[in-house]
Amino acid sequence: MAVMTDVSTTGTALRTPAAGAVKEGDVEKLRFIDEMTTNVDAVQERVLGEILGRNAGTEYLTKCGLDGATDRAAFRAKVPVVSYDDLQPYIQRIANGDRSPILSTHPVSEFLTSSGTSAGERKLMPTIMDELDRRQLLYSLLMPVMNLYVPGLDKGKGLYFLFVKSETKTPGGLTARPVLTSYYKSDHFKNRPYDPYHNYTSPTAAILCADAFQSMYAQMVCGLCQRNDVLRLGAVFASGLLRAIRFLQLNWEQLADDIESGELTPRVTDPSVREAVAAILLPDPELAKLIRAECSKGDWAGIITRVWPNTKYLDVIVTGAMAQYIPTLEFYSGGLPMACTMYASSECYFGLNLRPMCDPSEVSYTIMPNMGYFEFLPVDETGAASGDATQLVDLARVEVGREYELVITTYAGLNRYRVGDVLRVTGFHNAAPQFRFVRRKNVLLSIESDKTDEAELQRAVERASALLRPHGASVVEYTSQACTKRIPGHYVIYWELLTKGAGATVVDADTLGRCCLEMEEALNTVYRQSRVADGSIGPLEIRVVRPGTFEELMDYAISRGASINQYKVPRCVTFPPIVELLDSRVVSSHFSPALPHWTPARRSE
């Protein structure tokens, strides 16, 4: 096997950078990766033929006029590029109980929920039983690649903070839940055979506990009890791992008491969780003393390696919106490497990072051509991608340096579906392109799994600003930022107010607090669930800036070369000098005084 030490444009096989021996159990998996990435176009042609063949009798493809054709030419000529809004009527019929072959000839087994629609509701992505096999296949490739870079992971355990989220039933009786909740509750996960590379400190019962506090507490106490066995720490998102550290900051005294006595706090009431933890939590006064010593200092720099001294890396997603958490993770971990291992969504699992220990700024994912059929819409200089199907480029024919919007066709019945991810081609491994995640199309604010676009933010501001009218006040201009200086992160909205008229009064703090809550009520269900059920987003904050601040903002932009004729107030700011300018003009700050409304209600028709 030849050495692959960097992103390659030649035919190379995967091998450890140190040229060490590949473990016998990994050889087959690494060979599979090389076969898939060498024969990209042939695999893609086969996958498309399989998808079109098995779904030939569906209502959707029949309406497209394919007449059973399974070749690329017919597919390109007759199947349109679509968004969720185009498919929503078909999906709603399935959700309402129509079991005819609408999108897939295989029965829809459940819906996987994705981030919100323009109406603020979660998208429902149909899935089928054998999709679990494809997901499991991709998971099975991760550790063979990681073993090339980090030896000895089979000699210890992983402390992964994993959680299930609430699920609902559609009117037709199908379950609707997030993709990872579906996976954790599947037999693939619950009945997985022992594997030294997937040996976790968290009992399955703790992961499956729906109560966020009990689940986190149980996983944390088990991770502390096995501190010397932990070789890697992880969560799905960087924000999730930081939430776990914040949990330790708030609860270390109780955790230490439990470890000293060997008795779990009565705050954990779930019987299955208590039983699972009892097998791990034994009296350990010395460990309790160490935890108290480390956590009582008030110095949390490097806390991860101080508490879990054998940790080799963090396994978290730090690309896209999660990149904002990198400095905080570096602070708490003492500079441990961060591994981004795979690229997936509710619609489809796409691929993996063949250089998982690279710098977070250099993460590129190799899309595995067997997971679905992939096409790409070129993104122009303005960052927009047209919906013109004639512009679509095949997976094997993308160009290095270009940006594209990902379009997928899946076994579950999504045909030429625009995912909304914008990717940049960074190179090739064998014949397979490697992509850097650039951004989610149209997303303005994101703390974790929430995604708020400009139109939604505008509606929320309009709804909240109605509370100002009795005071003769209005919002003259606004912008926003996702603030992650504290854990959990929260939305910050900058308002410049205008008061006018003889009856104008000073807008009091109580009213501005209610404006914060009113904005939260107007945001999508994903945001509100994160606030209410998960606690992964903090209260929304409105910072009122002094009059003239947004004029100063424009002056600053023009001084840096912006055209006065084309200048528009940015609805989200991330550039530090601009954030500093805004913060220096703040005259008052207000937080949402309560939680917004959210319930995991049954989906109505």
Swiss-Prot record:
Enzyme Commission numbers on file: 6.3.2.-
Keywords per UniProt: Ligase, Plant defense
GO molecular function: acid-amino acid ligase activity; AMP binding; indole-3-acetic acid amido synthetase activity
Outcome of gene disruption: Slight increase in disease susceptibility to Xanthomonas oryzae pv oryzae.
Protein family per UniProt: Belongs to the IAA-amido conjugating enzyme family.
UniProt miscellaneous comment: Plants overexpressing GH3-8 exhibit enhanced disease resistance to Xanthomonas oryzae pv oryzae. Plants overexpressing GH3-8 exhibit abnormal morphology and dwarf phenotype. Plants silencing GH3-8 produce mostly non-viable pollen grains.
PANTHER family per the UniProt record, alphabetical: GH3 DOMAIN-CONTAINING PROTEIN, INDOLE-3-ACETIC ACID-AMIDO SYNTHETASE GH3.1-RELATED
Protein name in the entry: Indole-3-acetic acid-amido synthetase GH3.8
Native source organism of the sequence: Oryza sativa subsp. japonica
Lineage: Eukaryota, Viridiplantae, Streptophyta, Embryophyta, Tracheophyta
